[in-house]
Amino acid sequence: MSITGQPHVYKKDTIIRLKPLSLNSNNRSYVFSSSKGNIQNIINHLNNLNEIVGRSLLGIWRINSYFGLSKDPSESKSKNPSVFNTAKTIFKSGGVDYSSQLKEIKSLLEAQNTRIKNLENAIQSLDNKIQPEPLTKEEVKELKESINSIKEALKNIIG
């Protein structure tokens, strides 16, 4: 029996074998709703069904392999099944001990926090030294006069 005689899906130039649809019998009947019952219409319907089922199956495989629920037989980059891994085994599955890196990160964070505190204290001391300069009545009067002169000039321009 040829490989194409059994259920299969083509994906990336490889043939992926599927389990037979009915294990007990080879008699498969199909019902079609077409105006003509010729062989070409049946072939077209089968091709459409094959494409729909194949695309659905490939999508399900892609989702399952992305989440690590199953290993896609045609994807070399598919994740291995890791549904029952706990957080501890996920980090150790790479074979790298991250405790030394975590200690380094902790010391870097502590140093960064002290720098931030020093900067905040420096900013606070500078803010305390700055005193706002009070406006005099003369400056307010000059500002009013300049605004009024601008208004008059605009009235002359606009009309």
Swiss-Prot record:
Domain of life where this protein originates: Viruses
Record-linked InterPro entries: Caulimo_AT (IPR004917)
Family: Belongs to the caulimoviridae ORF II family.
Biological role: This protein is involved in virus transmission.
Annotated protein name in UniProt: Aphid transmission protein
